[in-house]
Amino acid sequence: MKNLDQRNQIIEHSLKLNSTNLSPLRSGNISLRAEQDNIQGYLITPSGKKYETLKPEDIVFMGLNEEAENNDSVNKPSSEWRFHRDIYVNKKDAQAIVHAHSPHATAVSSHGKSIPPFHYMIALAGGEDIKCAEYATFGTKELSQNVIKALENRSACLMSNHGQVAFGKNL
């Protein structure tokens, strides 16, 4: 199986999302930048599968130029595949992405406002505050555009009424 180590990393960290209550139930998604058959892309958690049952073959490879409906994997990619793809396209330093629906971040994001620099740890997101992407329906192009805008000069943002997303060098 191609990219087995990366697939296992995604499963390991997906389980951590559940066990730490960062993304209860089947919510949230994780991806890693990857190459398969000389195609640049990313591996992403599948849609609708419980993390506890994930196997390496369940993780979906998506090319950076691919739309979900054209993917021939047995499993469908996460419904949020679009903003994962767009982050990888727009943020060349992004190697891993985690999107979670933590109860705390979702509650804070319902205000639709950025988190001000009240603590030095805010700087870890890459700016003087943590932006909040405007609300849009999950899985849409509009949501992806809103996330990319909120991530300008940053590596993390809230998603209004939805949770948070962050990218980095690894999981």
Please name every model-derived segment.
Residues 1-171:
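Glycine-rich flexible loops
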